[in-house]
């Protein structure tokens, strides 16, 4: 018995991340090899991006993906999000030369207010939303606050790229396989202030913290490397990390939809007050996923160094929140 197709809306669909993402959604990597999909693709109402989107759709056609039932191109979120079961909000305004962060927040605030309102109006009442476009946590917060009729818990921000970057650095440091790393998490904002935390992590049942046993490396090499990895990639490649971001989006949605089998992953989610994080703050937490729902891993001890790092990333998020308060 074949499954009923689900509707997946993707914004910024003709952009670099969109291009790295859509083929993997259509091939079944995100929702499973037995789950047919309908792609509802949104781009800005400008000739260039709309034309580019048509080209991407031609390529998707040419892949003859068995699971891709239908796809549509849109310039209006009110049609793009119609009955969407999943929405990946990839498109955002990047920071231009000489642009202040406050300006960036304002420009994106307008985009995500409109998209939140559109989701509220027309998406499935159970839509699962992932915000990839930066500043991801605050954009997700804006979308959530603009969609009062949808469950707040269905709005998430992407911290998985930071999580995967941290796992990769730990694998390189220990000489172990990245697939064997468990119980790693990233707290806070998707920004250089994020706190990648391997205090509870294990590889083959052994403590990663004991294996590495080097607080100097943790504070002065590991955390800055993970935090500034995006900038390092722009420096090396001449453009931003698109394929790794798309890969993280696939990981995030797959785990949310299909479950993590008890493994910890990191998701940016609205706080319920856990670990002293103010309610509704869109914050990276350790979670497990089962039956389409995520659950925060509770009861972890927060030592002095960790508390200090969590406070730094929280302060940044509170500042961003204050910066967009007038939009909501």
From Swiss-Prot:
Alphabetical UniProt keywords = NAD, Oxidoreductase, Tricarboxylic acid cycle
The catalysed reaction is: (S)-malate + NAD(+) = oxaloacetate + NADH + H(+)
Question: What Pfam families does the database record attribute to this sequence?
Answer: Ldh_1_C (PF02866), Ldh_1_N (PF00056)
* CDD domains linked: MDH_chloroplast-like
In its UniProt record, a GO molecular function of this protein is: L-malate dehydrogenase (NAD+) activity
Biological process, per Gene Ontology: malate metabolic process; tricarboxylic acid cycle
Task: Report the top EC class in one word.
Answer: oxidoreductase
> EC number(s) of the enzyme?
1.1.1.37
Q: What name is this protein filed under?
A: Malate dehydrogenase
Gene (UniProt)? mdh
């Amino acid at each position: 018995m074949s499954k009923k197709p689900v509707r997946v809306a993707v914004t910024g669909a003709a952009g670099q991340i969109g291009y790295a993402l859509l083929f993997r959604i259509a091939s079944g990597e995100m929702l499973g090899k037995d789950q047919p999909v309908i792609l509802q693709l949104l781009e800005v109402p400008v000739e260039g991006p709309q034309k580019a989107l048509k080209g991407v759709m031609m390529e998707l056609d040419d892949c003859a993906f068995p699971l891709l039932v239908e796809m549509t191109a849109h310039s209006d979120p009110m049609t793009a999000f119609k009955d969407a079961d999943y929405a990946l909000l990839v498109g955002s305004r990047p920071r231009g030369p000489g642009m202040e962060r406050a300006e960036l927040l304002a420009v994106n605030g307008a985009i995500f207010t409109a998209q939140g309102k559109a989701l509220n109006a027309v998406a499935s009442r159970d839509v699962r939303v992932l915000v990839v476009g930066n500043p991801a946590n605050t954009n997700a917060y804006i979308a959530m606050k603009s969609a009062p009729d949808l469950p707040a818990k269905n709005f998430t921000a992407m911290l998985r790229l930071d999580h995967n970057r941290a796992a990769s650095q730990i694998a390189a440091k220990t000489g172990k396989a990245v697939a064997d790393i468990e119980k790693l998490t990233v707290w806070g904002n998707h920004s250089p202030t994020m706190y990648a935390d391997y205090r509870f992590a294990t590889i083959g049942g052994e403590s990663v913290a004991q294996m590495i046993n080097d607080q100097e490396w943790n504070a002065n090499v590991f955390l800055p490397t993970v935090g500034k990895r995006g900038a390092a990639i722009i420096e090396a490649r001449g453009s931003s990390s698109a394929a790794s971001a798309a890969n993280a989006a696939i990981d995030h949605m797959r785990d949310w939809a299909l479950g993590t089998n008890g493994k910890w992953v990191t998701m940016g989610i609205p706080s319920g007050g856990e670990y002293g994080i103010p309610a509704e703050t869109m914050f990276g937490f350790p979670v497990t996923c089962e039956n389409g729902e995520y659950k925060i891993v509770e009861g972890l001890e927060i030592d002095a160094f960790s508390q200090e790092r969590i406070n730094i990333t929280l302060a940044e998020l509170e500042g961003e929140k204050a910066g967009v308060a007038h939009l909501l």
